[in-house]
Amino acid sequence: MPGVPGAVCRAVLFGKNNMVTKTIGNKPAIGLCGTGIIDVMYELVRHHIVDTQGILGEPWFEKGFPVVPGKIYFTQEDIRQVQMAKAAICAGLEVLLQKSNISHEQIKKVYVAGGFGMGLDMEKALGIGLLPIGLRGKLTPVGNSALELSLIHI
């Protein structure tokens, strides 16, 4: 879901059952926005609730992991969608590097744009492989850079 009031944008898991969340605008939770999805995925991997193959463990496999019990569940299908997004981002980056004839090591800075980039916990994105680990320390959120760049050219 988009980053609207009530979207879970932050999540931290304590133990195996206590997911503490923050929503946009501190409103009642209505779903997960992109940054919330990354946080939940990271926490489930960190606590070995999702294994290295991306399989949600028992007893959560059938119904999903309760992010907000009785209301919002993170399912096996959600995990597959994250895996597909990771694959697309990594493939895109690899093609860009190959076409530019440069390596990860030669990258000095990566600007992560948009509202998603501003709210993204870079360490969690690195931790789940959404972004290559070689970019640690090189990631800079820049917000709505398209709008800013267009204003510069007016």
What is each of the regions a protein language model found here?
Residues 8, 16, 100, 104-105, ...:
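Non-transmembrane, aqueous-exposed alpha-helical and coiled segments at domain scale
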Residues 83-105:
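Phosphate/ATP-binding catalytic cores across multiple sugar-kinase/actin-like superfamilies
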Residues 104-124:
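Glycine-rich phosphate-binding loops at beta-strand->alpha-helix junctions
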Residues 1-35, 121-143:
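Glycine-rich phosphate-binding loop of actin/hexokinase-like ATP-binding domains
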Residues 76-85, 129-150:
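Glycine-rich and small/hydrophobic secondary-structure elements
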